[in-house]
Amino acid sequence: MDLKLSEEEMLLKNAAAQFVQKELLNIEGSFLKQKEPFLPPGDPPRRELDPVVRKTLIEKAKKVGLWALELSEESGGSGLSHIARTLIHREFGKTVLPFEPPSIPRLMAASRHAERIVEGELSLSLAFDEIHKTGKLDQIRASYRPCPNGCCLNSSGIDVINPSSDFFLLPAKEETSGQSGLFLLDRDASGLSIKDEVDLTTDATVARLTLNECRISSDRLLGHEDEMRRIIAAEQLRIAARSLGIGTRCLENALEHASNRVTFGRPLSSRQAIQWMVADLSVSLRTSTWLTLEAAWKADQGLPYFDAAALAKKRAARMAFEAADVAIQIHGGYGVCKEFPFETFYREARLMRLLYGQEAGIDRAIGEIFLKAG
């Protein structure tokens, strides 16, 4: 395995680091700062990026090739390798600002809406609810059957993150054959309803998507099982890469604070308990980095990588959660203030541990593979 970065990959990594530092971290503080000293009674409002700021950031990201990373250049994307995408998502993971390159699967190039999604005029969400639990396709509950000029879809309810999106990519199984299909659904499609929207612990929402004889044209069937597996693996690698960014930011900030903070006449960094925490975290971060880069390298080499991506996601997301916890402990009371990023990282990392395969399910699947190989 040769993980030496190409010249293009180094340039993209540096461009992403500069973009995050100049455009995102510089405004992170104002985003985190509450407008009022005390929140009003009831649920606290969700923090959202100003639409004008978001539009400006999208234009700047597109100019430097940091947008729609997976789509080909012909479709308006960057057409980057898995390694390059991993390096870029790692840099964007260093900030809690809700801005990163969108997940637009390559198969979306076949849709007439691809260009407007890339431009940010339309939004896309992955309605992969059941797959979040195990990362496997055998949990799909939505069903479809052929009907005149297309397909009819039914589902009792699917949890969808970011339910305000214009389109949803939804996997479903054919009622008789059991063959899986991946469909592009318009939120205004007949028979599709979205209700019971609730806030997550992160600055996002989830709602229930129900399909009742939802009729769509045949051109909305974009793929089958192979395409679904590639999307799952791509999301697992994205989560793993973002987790590396979280871990790196938390470790760097924790080291800086421990060196500068003096208690009882001594810097925190001189205390053995602090030294153990940062030592363990640095080892965990390095382990997660190698697992993630190995999975991305396998994908670029055309080698089997689905299990490697799942393992990298599981290890890296847990590392990010632990990194946020360490940063909170070392920063003390500052660590849980909303004007610092660590409590947001903590909540985000906990959610990422649940997405596209929970840890127990991944452990079981990987364990079975190892036992069979032995």
Question: Model-derived features: where do they sit?
Answer:
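Glycine-rich phosphate/pyrophosphate-binding beta-alpha loops
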Residues: I158-P163, I239, L351-Q358
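A short, Trp-centered hydrophobic/proline-enriched beta-strand micro-motif
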Residues: G120-I131
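A short core secondary-structure module
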Residues: G150, N154-S193
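N-terminal glycine-rich flavin-associated loop
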Residues: P98-R116, T134-L137
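C-terminal helix-coil-helix/basic helical segment that borders enzyme active sites and/or dimer interfaces
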Residues: E28-P45, L255, S259, T263-R266, ...
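Glycine-rich beta->alpha junctions and the first turn(s) of the following alpha-helix
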Residues: D2-N14, L192-R286, M352, G374
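Amphipathic, small/basic residue-rich leader segments at the start of a protein or domain
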Residues: M1-P101, F370-G374
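Glycine-rich phosphate/cofactor-binding loops in nucleotide/flavin-utilizing enzymes
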Residues: D2-L5, L87-I88, R106, H331-G374
